[in-house]
Amino acid sequence: MERTIEKPRIRVSADNRAFLETSRLVSACGLNTVCQEAACPNISECWSSKHVTVMILGSVCTRACRFCNVTTGKPELLDPHEPEKLASAVGKLGLRHVVITSVDRDDLDDGGAEHFASCVRRIRETSPGTSIEVLTPDFLGKVGARDIIIAAAPDVFNHNVETVPRLHPKIRIKARYFNSLSLLEEVKRKDPRIFTKSGLMLGLGEERSEVLQVMDDMRVAGIDFLTIGQYLRPSKKHMEVQRYATDEEFQYYKEAAYARGFLMVASSALTRSSYHADEDFLHLKNARAGALAKLV
């Protein structure tokens, strides 16, 4: 693709009072959120709608991926009370759908998998009507980590491949493209009831043919939901944006993904892994029901 640098105008609407109330509750509950740590462009809109993506396992990551704004360094000790605090916060915020993500914790024997599972179980106990989505790291392929979370039975298991295989070595520190696909494939194989989800960023130097190949690979792995968004450089220390995709390109990829059989596709400049995740979960359930009805 031709290198193009032309940043689109992005406007996000927000209810200021609702945003401030969510901000107050997040602070009062002592939550870390990826919304803040990753400098997400959608924070105003999401928090105005009381949609929060919580970040567990601390706020310091053991990796330094070139696209990510989360702090890198030596992580703090795990908070054993975090599952309880998180469950309480979900209740106070009145969340219909909660997304739980984390920093990478390569220093832990299980990569933090048991902590993830504890959070899922505690929310199930205290807010049984809330659907739960986990957005996990790859756990460095640590034995048993994936199965611990599968056993906790989140509604959605999300793990992002982020970019095309050719760009992985310089974009995703320690991560491997096919390890990420294998993680999601095993989730679907071991519990087909769990929706699987993954995401891509555009603007890192990928070619159209490479993006389409990733879609094909994802479908072979049985992934249900694909998100595609524009990479935005968090700071001058991070990877430069190679180009800004047009609305037409996002629409092209959306149509190409649906043609390949994804149940759900979100594709736009502002799309992020958990953007509109509560609404998308309802669409996912309806799409699966519709697909199953056609088989009867």
Swiss-Prot record:
Keywords: 4Fe-4S, Cytoplasm, Iron, Iron-sulfur, Metal-binding, S-adenosyl-L-methionine, Transferase
GO molecular function terms noted in the UniProt entry: 4 iron, 4 sulfur cluster binding; lipoate synthase activity; metal ion binding
Cofactor requirements of the protein: [4Fe-4S] cluster
Amino-acid positions noted as binding [4Fe-4S] cluster 1 in the UniProt annotation, renumbered to this chain: 35, 40, 46, 274
Catalytic activities: [[Fe-S] cluster scaffold protein carrying a second [4Fe-4S](2+) cluster] + N(6)-octanoyl-L-lysyl-[protein] + 2 oxidized [2Fe-2S]-[ferredoxin] + 2 S-adenosyl-L-methionine + 4 H(+) = [[Fe-S] cluster scaffold protein] + N(6)-[(R)-dihydrolipoyl]-L-lysyl-[protein] + 4 Fe(3+) + 2 hydrogen sulfide + 2 5'-deoxyadenosine + 2 L-methionine + 2 reduced [2Fe-2S]-[ferredoxin]
Residues reported in the UniProt entry to bind [4Fe-4S] cluster 2: 61, 65, 68
Keyword Transferase set for record: yes
Cofactor note as given: Binds 2 [4Fe-4S] clusters per subunit. One cluster is coordinated with 3 cysteines and an exchangeable S-adenosyl-L-methionine.
Enzyme Commission code: 2.8.1.8
PROSITE patterns recorded: RADICAL_SAM
Associated pathway: Protein modification; protein lipoylation via endogenous pathway; protein N(6)-(lipoyl)lysine from octanoyl-[acyl-carrier-protein]: step 2/2
Top enzyme class: transferase
Entry-linked Gene3D superfamilies: Aldolase class I
Organism domain of life: Bacteria
Stored NCBIfam families: lipA, PRK05481.1, PRK12928.1
Recorded family membership: Belongs to the radical SAM superfamily. Lipoyl synthase family.
Name of the protein this chain belongs to: Lipoyl synthase
